[in-house]
From Swiss-Prot:
GO molecular function: serine-type endopeptidase activity
Name by which UniProt lists this protein: Uncharacterized protein ML1171
Source species of the chain: Mycobacterium leprae (strain TN)
Alphabetically ordered keywords of this record: Cell membrane, Membrane, Transmembrane, Transmembrane helix
UniProt membrane topology term: Multi-pass membrane protein
InterPro entries linked to this entry: Peptidase_S54_rhomboid_dom (IPR022764), Rhomboid-like_sf (IPR035952), Rhomboid_protease_S54 (IPR050925)
Similarity annotation: To M.tuberculosis Rv1337.
SUPFAM superfamilies cross-referenced by the UniProt entry: Rhomboid-like
Amino acid sequence: MTPTGDWYKGGDEVGAPSACGGGSALMTLPEKNLGYKPETETNRRLRWMVGGVTILTFMALLYLVELIDQLTRHSLDNNGIRLLKTDVLWGISFAPVLHANWQHLVANTIPLLVLGFLIALAGLSRFIWVTAMVWIFGGSATWLIGNMGSSFGPTDHIGVSGLIFGWLAFLLVFGLFVRRGWDIIGCMVLFAYGGVLLGVMPVLGRCGGVSWQGHLCGAISGVVAAYLLSAPERKTRALKEAGTDSPRLKT
């Protein structure tokens, strides 16, 4: 998938007189320096609007779920990810939208808005793929190692912080893979919000612990997502570095 705003090149076919007299021969010329065609201002605004609406809608969903949870005396909190329980699909599906309390959700709000918006700017399709991969793969891995290193006994993993760590890892690694401004953006986000992520860890509702397992699994899933979703850009870069991109034979 190519994000909105990628550029394209063009070239011309040239007919030149043949050295043998008569007719013409096709020539191989480097592409004209037509420059890159940036996205229009309208497309840029639309992309920002779609990104903003997407992440704000998701955030509104989280607050709605927490409101329902509060009104039902935390009846939803038991639906998180629990180690090797047979209701694994249920836990993986709902754990990221559940939070122990309002403080837990508020602590995750700013990193979620910033990181989610940055990924959404790359396109709605890419945002959906990244989120789905971190959500499913990170949740599945947490289901496998959920109690590792825990001194509280069986744990119930809830909260969107695993997804946040996945998004952060994706931004950093994706930028390194494609060698574009994403790595700079990712590093800026890391320095700006890394302290928030480390200092305000999500709290599990009943055991008072930190789901470092969910954070770790989410981050690993983000790295995997970055590798898989950067394949088109990496392939294009490899072709350019191999010298197969220009000059081209114009026919």
